[in-house]
A protein has these predicted regions:
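Glycine- and aromatic-enriched membrane insertion/assembly motifs of diderm outer-membrane
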Residues: 98, 124-163
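Residues that define the transmembrane beta-barrel architecture of outer-membrane proteins
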Residues: 95, 128-135, 189-194, 203, ...
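Short loop/turn motifs that connect adjacent beta-strands in outer-membrane beta-barrel proteins
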Residues: 83-99, 143-153, 204, 216, ...
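Surface-exposed strand-loop-strand hairpins of Gram-negative outer-membrane beta-barrel proteins
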Residues: 93-96, 108-132, 437-447
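Residues on the lipid-exposed face of transmembrane beta-strands in outer-membrane beta-barrel proteins
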Residues: 101, 132-141, 195-200, 209, ...
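Outer-membrane beta-barrel pore domains
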Residues: 30, 121-124, 165-168, 182-186, ...
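Surface-exposed coil loops of outer-membrane beta-barrel proteins
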Residues: 112-127, 131, 164-284, 292-301, ...
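N-terminal periplasmic/intermembrane-space "pro-region" immediately following the signal or transit peptide
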Residues: 10, 16, 21-120
Length: 462
């Protein structure tokens, strides 16, 4: 797998050079790239653009980018697309390579004021203080397919610096295969490369090879893709963040896309024990875009067992969510995840966990949007659920392992999005969390079973 990692990185560089050489003319009329059009979702949820024609070639997006846009487009309500953010760099001349990104930072006030300043299960705002979460840079050469050019090659590299780096690290990439630090020595701020892949497109097929975001789940580690500052428990504990391997997408029609891929487990590039996993799924969005249905499943020897971290046991997890537009202003998203892992302990028992998340959004006007979220994560064996961040507290006091609390944890969040212009968004929220299990308390430095927080962050796109 070490050889595989270096081949992937070399392939990304080579294909970027090849893509640059292939470029003949700039992509006319681009103000910004549609991969990060959450601003459309934040302002009356614009519909997807019309299908491409022979006279206007389709610029294909990477799979993860297309997934993020589908989330936005499935929340359609206006006939006009929201304005794109102005770009500091944007497209590099005639190369078709785009450089974009954003800054994301915010603060959280915890009603308990824990001495450690850690907010228990909250993420990514896990500190009771200001955090610079993401300096996120995207270097991308999108695919461009038309009748005269049925195939193309591109790629994408994402770089993230900030406190969110720990949620996107991959074993054997940013860390050593055993999980010990390699790129980053601290527990607060660090650098990660959550995506680095080559994209090969032919007609309706799109093959991504390298490291990429998972197709499971509704929320994303990219701040611009989410309504709330804090993330749901499913993304925090159950779902993978990235995979290393290959993912094939078949766009059967404008309504249906199919996915299948082979990966080296989850959040792993080169582990002590490498394992093969399969991911597959689909996205269905009818022409009227009244609703959208996403389903994805992952299976294989994906996670180390509780009994021995060097032994990987069979694990299966699925994620599905339904987006439904009641009107142009009201939208609902319902998500269900479930997972099973065999031989998680010395007795050979099977662990299971599941989650349910419900969202309700209301578009007030072009600048304001309100949202509610209820979140439930149930982990009867305590294989996933836990409190604090990896590492040690100031003064040398160790933090507990991030799992081991059996039971269910729930939260209710209410928030607003204020988008005065396409380049800036403010996300205030209030959140109540409570734990109903029999393990160690999750909040206020493991002394309480509930907590109340107020948080707000700002996103500046460039």
């Amino acid at each position: 797998m070490r050889i595989m990692k270096y081949l992937i990185l070399c392939g990304v560089v080579v294909c970027f050079v090849a893509a640059t050489a292939m470029a003949q003319t700039p992509n006319r009329g681009d103000v910004g790239q549609p991969w990060n059009n959450y601003m459309a979702f934040a302002s009356d949820n614009a519909p997807a653009p019309p299908p491409a024609t022979a006279t206007q070639p389709e610029e294909k997006k990477s799979d993860a980018a297309a997934d993020e846009e589908k989330k936005d487009d499935s929340a359609s309500g206006d006939e006009d697309k929201a304005p794109e953010p102005k770009r500091l760099i944007g497209q590099l001349g005639c190369t078709k390579i785009n450089i974009t990104g954003w800054l994301d930072g915010g603060g959280t006030i915890n009603g308990d004021s824990p001495a450690s300043r850690y907010n228990g299960t909250l993420a990514p705002n896990d500190r009771n203080e200001f955090q610079f979460n993401q300096l996120y840079t995207v270097i991308e050469r999108p695919l461009k397919i038309d009748d005269c050019h049925p195939w193309d090659i591109g790629g994408r590299v994402d770089l993230l610096y900030g406190t969110d780096y720990i949620y996107t690290e991959s074993l054997g990439f940013e860390t050593h295969p055993d999980g010990s630090p390699k790129w980053n020595s601290g527990i607060d701020y660090g650098l990660a490369m959550p995506q680095a892949y080559v994209d090969i497109g032919y007609d309706k097929f799109d093959l991504k090879i390298g490291r990429f975001y998972t197709i499971l789940g509704y929320e994303s580690m990219m701040a611009i893709s989410n309504f709330f500052y804090s993330m749901n428990y499913t993304l925090r504990y159950a779902e993978p963040t990235t995979h290393t391997g290959g993912l094939l997408t078949y766009k059967k029609s404008d309504e249906l896309s199919l996915y299948v891929g082979g990966v080296n487990g989850q959040d792993e590039t080169d582990g002590v024990v490498d394992s093969f996993g399969v991911i597959t799924g689909f996205n269905w969005t009818p022409k009227d875009q009244k609703y959208a249905l996403n389903f994805a499943i992952m299976t294989g020897c994906l996670d180390p067992t509780t009994a021995d971290p060097n032994i990987y046991a069979p694990r299966t997890e699925f994620s599905t969510y339904l987006t439904y537009n009641f009107t142009k202003k009201w939208q609902s998203v319902s998500q269900v995840d479930a997972g099973w892992q065999q031989n998680y302990d010395l007795a050979g028992d099977t662990a299971d966990y599941w989650s349910f998340t419900q969202y309700l959004f209301y578009t007030i006007n072009d600048c304001w949007k309100a949202g509610l979220r209820y979140d439930l994560f149930n982990d009867d064996q305590g294989t996933k659920l836990g409190g604090l961040r990896f590492g040690g507290l100031p003064g040398g006091n160790p933090l507990p392992l991030p799992s081991g609390d059996a039971g269910a944890v729930q939260s209710i969040s209410a928030g607003l999005n204020w988008t005065p212009n396409p380049n800036f968004r403010l996300r205030p929220e209030v959140r109540w969390d409570w734990y109903g299990g029999h393990g160690v308390p999750l909040f206020d430095d493991e002394t309480k079973n509930s907590q109340f927080t107020v948080a707000c962050d700002g996103i500046i796109q460039f």
